[in-house]
């Protein structure tokens, strides 16, 4: 839905029963901080309308992160920081931007997914599960997220998975573990 985020537009969009919402910055607002402020206000409006909806918000300026918590958005993606990081990686490791970019484009093979740790993996080491996950499910384990939300990419092989952990995997489709 484009345009103003109002109770009427949220009702028309079905936000009362939606699982997720994505808030994109308005290209009509040239000032990046103004654009981000509008996005954060829209996020807050959506959360007030439906507190259970998962809101992902696009920001353009990392300095806007200081106000992001007020918006109650569940996830914030700072586009400027992503582009800057991608460019710096490409300058340091020629060609790496193709691999990184392909992981976030859904039309590509091999997308990053965040999935719950299966019961059969609880108490086992990350290293022991690498080959098993690849051979049995054709997925590549790349990280572990703790119950506190801390993400560790490429953790040590002896890192043990717990029942409240999530794993970051690369797969051709969402794995059913």
Task: Outline where the language-model segments fall.
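Cytosolic regulatory regions of ion transport systems
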Residues: 1-177
């Amino acid at each position: 839905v484009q345009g103003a985020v109002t109770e009427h537009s949220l009702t028309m969009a079905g936000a009362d029963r939606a699982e997720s919402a994505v808030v994109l910055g308005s290209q009509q607002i040239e000032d990046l901080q103004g654009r981000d402020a509008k996005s954060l206000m829209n996020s807050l409006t959506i959360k007030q309308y439906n507190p259970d909806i998962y809101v992902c918000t696009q920001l353009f300026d990392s300095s806007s992160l200081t106000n992001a918590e007020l918006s109650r958005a569940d996830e914030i993606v700072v586009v400027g920081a992503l582009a800057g990081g991608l460019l710096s990686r490409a300058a340091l490791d020629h060609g790496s931007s193709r691999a990184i970019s392909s992981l976030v484009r859904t039309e590509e093979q091999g997308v990053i997914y965040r999935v719950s740790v299966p019961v059969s993996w609880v108490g086992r080491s990350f290293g022991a599960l690498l080959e098993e996950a690849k051979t049995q499910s054709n997925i590549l384990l790349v990280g572990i997220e703790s119950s506190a939300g801390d993400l560790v990419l490429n953790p040590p092989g002896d890192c043990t998975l717990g029942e409240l952990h999530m794993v970051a995997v690369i797969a051709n489709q969402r794995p059913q573990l």
